[in-house]
């Protein structure tokens, strides 16, 4: 983590132009994918510990979209929508001796309002601090085609609060298209990156 923040700081210090990459009124849209997916990692660890050949685990995300409007030259407000999922599936014989499929799944969706402070902005790079808060919902759901088994869904979001603090960067290869990188804590996981567009 410290090394990554150091790299962010080094690049931020090498400004090649005084021209602003983002200006008041600019709209920025990021599509991103984050890592790690902690629930996916936990499910995979359980499967590995069980050493079962008929059990599989997987997941997707965090996968998200951010939109930001520059209310001032260095200050932006926006929204962040993020989805992730993790699952474990097992094929086994039920109490009646017939083969059935069993699945445990934990999807999560979060929607946040965000505030960004852009501390470095040049023709090619944009570095910013991000803080956000909003709503999230995570459930733990069991499903099966076994008629003798009761399916269930549990709300795992104790406070239903989504939040994130961190730093991010956008590197533009053209006037309107680039990539984004982020490191922080909360929605979107520890690391995330993807494609950025500027309007």
Residue ranges of predicted features:
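Short, charge-rich binding segments
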Residues: 103-105, 118-122
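Short glycine/proline- and aromatic-enriched beta-strand/turn motifs that initiate or cap beta-hairpins
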Residues: 20-71, 190-198
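Flexible, solvent-exposed loop segments that connect beta-strands
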Residues: 39-56, 82-111, 135-160
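Residues on the lipid-exposed face of transmembrane beta-strands in outer-membrane beta-barrel proteins
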Residues: 31, 65-69, 111-117, 131-135, ...
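Cleavable N-terminal export/targeting peptides
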Residues: 1-26
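Outer-membrane beta-barrel channels and translocator barrels
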Residues: 22-24, 36, 70-74, 84, ...
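Residues that define the transmembrane beta-barrel architecture of outer-membrane proteins
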Residues: 25-27, 57-63, 105-111, 125, ...
